């Protein structure tokens, strides 16, 4: 036993960090293997599944690509979807090609692989080698690869939203002006992919104002978990102006098009469908929600908050919200709703790229809590620094998106809405756990953390090998 513990102590630095030249080489090789595997698996799936262009999202994106053929900038919207992905498809492919839809899916797989490479660098800059590799693999297998087999904006949006969250969290504790510029650019690009970035951006602005007021009122007299020496109140207003200027400069062509077409720069049909009772009503009655059109409808038929509460009472609203939240929690953490290890039938085509995707999140969160307990027992939590505002922003974001997507279930039941949170949640629990392990300075923390991540590595590697050996899919479930 003593020799085993010595061996574990010897290999721990190579797997948990700090990074060494050999660790970097091994990590790069592993990421290249992962990206190559994603290419093989993803292209096989696109060749086997999803050959019918549906009349809604995928069909609409195809139509948007044709409209933006030859465009110098992503400016066009159909009132529901944003233009970044169809614009890229129009630039990199020929929208008039009979195989445009199939090639567009292949392009999306390629974008998912590029996103995986970007995510690998992101995690490598924040956690140790093993945790970074597991995080990268989970992002790709659980989120990026499944949705990339469709013709849609999600792969681009998911990785951009992760970077937006990371940049915003950092800006709550240190605020150099270039970081505000970066946030404005990233948020604008994410919004051009999908407008789902907007609630988080608003929350960030609110928490930034809280940080500003705290700094002006208390200065360095705040407790350790709020004190942020790298955050300067004098930079806030200038940084905010830089951020907003970059944001609106990038999305301006899209806003101009919307204003000319529908009379409102931020016209967006899903914001009206949010208050509808079901998808059929959206299709049949709410295809046009311009103000002049809504004015012709009785109040109780309008897709607005006022219209909803003319049709329903508070009890109905609470039932809808509660039921929707339960649906979204199941979709995020345990979509299979089966507790056996294998959810697939032998000799049958697959439907899931990574089974039990949410249980990995739960396991990593539990591991982070264990690391927190060890660090607290050592009296070293203060070494974490100013964590309160980033943690509160994270929790608020989770609750807001959970309730918003839960409310939206009757009109938008797809998994992709709640999967917006998967990669940011993964980043938070992994980086939090790694930092807590490091500050604890305890051998026990290293042993437990190493054991947990080695177990995850074995599970993920076995799944990749299994998919390489047998990539027969009849459809992709729990993604779109």
Language model regions located:
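Membrane-interface anchor segments at the N-terminal boundary of transmembrane helices
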Residues: 23-26, 99-110, 310-395, 422-423
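Extracytoplasmic catalytic/substrate-binding loops of multi-pass membrane glycan-assembly enzymes
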Residues: 47-62, 75-88, 98-102, 262-269
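Short acidic/glycine- and proline-prone juxtamembrane loop motifs at membrane-interface regions
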Residues: 81, 149-157
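Transmembrane-helix motifs of polytopic, lipid-linked glycan transferases
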Residues: 106-127, 159, 163, 167, ...
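Transmembrane-helix signature of polytopic, membrane-embedded enzymes
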Residues: 119-142, 158-159, 174-178, 182
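Membrane-interface transmembrane helices that cradle and orient dolichyl/undecaprenyl
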Residues: 125-127, 164-179, 190, 212-219, ...
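Membrane-interface alpha helices of multi-pass inner-membrane proteins
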Residues: 135, 167, 179-195, 201, ...
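Membrane-lumen/periplasm interface segments of specific transmembrane helices
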Residues: 236-364, 462-470
């Amino acid at each position: 036993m003593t020799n085993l513990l010595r061996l574990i102590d010897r290999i721990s630095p190579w797997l948990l960090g700090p990074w060494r030249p050999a660790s970097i080489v091994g990590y790069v090789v592993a990421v290249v293997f992962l990206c190559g595997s994603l290419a093989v698996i993803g292209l096989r799936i696109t060749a086997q599944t999803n050959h019918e262009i549906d009349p809604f999202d995928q069909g609409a994106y195809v139509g948007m690509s044709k409209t933006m053929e030859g465009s110098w900038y992503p400016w066009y919207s159909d009132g529901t979807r944003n233009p970044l992905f169809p614009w890229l498809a129009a630039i990199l492919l020929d929208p008039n090609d009979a195989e445009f839809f199939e090639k567009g899916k292949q392009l999306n797989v390629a974008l998912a692989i590029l996103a995986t490479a970007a995510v690998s660098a992101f995690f490598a800059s924040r956690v140790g080698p093993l945790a970074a590799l597991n995080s990268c693999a989970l992002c790709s297998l659980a989120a990026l690869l499944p949705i990339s087999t469709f013709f849609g904006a999600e792969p681009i949006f998911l990785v951009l939203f992760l970077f937006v969250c990371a940049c915003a969290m950092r800006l709550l504790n240190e605020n150099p002006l270039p970081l505000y510029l970066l946030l404005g650019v990233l948020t604008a690009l994410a919004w051009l992919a999908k407008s789902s970035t907007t609630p988080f951006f608003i929350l960030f602005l609110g928490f930034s104002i809280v940080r500003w007021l705290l700094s002006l009122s208390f200065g360095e007299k705040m407790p350790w978990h709020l004190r942020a020496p790298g955050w300067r109140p004098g930079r806030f207003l200038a940084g905010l102006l830089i951020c907003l200027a970059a944001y609106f400069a990038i999305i301006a062509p899209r806003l101009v098009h919307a204003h000319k077409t529908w009379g409102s720069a931020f016209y967006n049909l899903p914001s009206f469908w949010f208050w509808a009772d079901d998808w059929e009503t959206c299709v049949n009655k709410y295809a046009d929600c311009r103000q002049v059109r809504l004015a012709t409808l009785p109040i109780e038929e309008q897709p607005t908050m006022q219209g909803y509460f003319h049709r329903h009472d508070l009890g109905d609203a609470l039932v809808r919200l509660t039921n929707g939240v339960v649906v979204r929690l199941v979709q995020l953490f345990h979509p299979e709703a089966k507790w056996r290890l294998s959810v697939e039938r032998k000799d049958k085509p697959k439907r899931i790229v990574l089974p039990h995707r949410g249980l990995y999140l739960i396991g990593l969160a539990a591991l982070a809590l264990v690391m927190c307990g060890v660090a607290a027992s050592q009296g070293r939590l203060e070494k974490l620094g100013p964590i309160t505002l980033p943690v509160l922003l994270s929790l608020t974001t989770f609750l807001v998106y959970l309730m918003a997507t839960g409310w939206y279930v009757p009109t938008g039941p797809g998994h992709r809405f709640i999967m917006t949170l998967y990669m940011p949640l993964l980043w938070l629990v992994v980086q939090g756990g790694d930092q807590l392990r490091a500050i604890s300075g305890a051998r026990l923390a290293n042993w437990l953390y190493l054991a947990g991540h080695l177990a995850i590595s074995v599970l993920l590697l076995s799944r990749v090998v299994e998919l390489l050996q047998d990539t027969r899919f009849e459809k992709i479930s729990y993604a779109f």
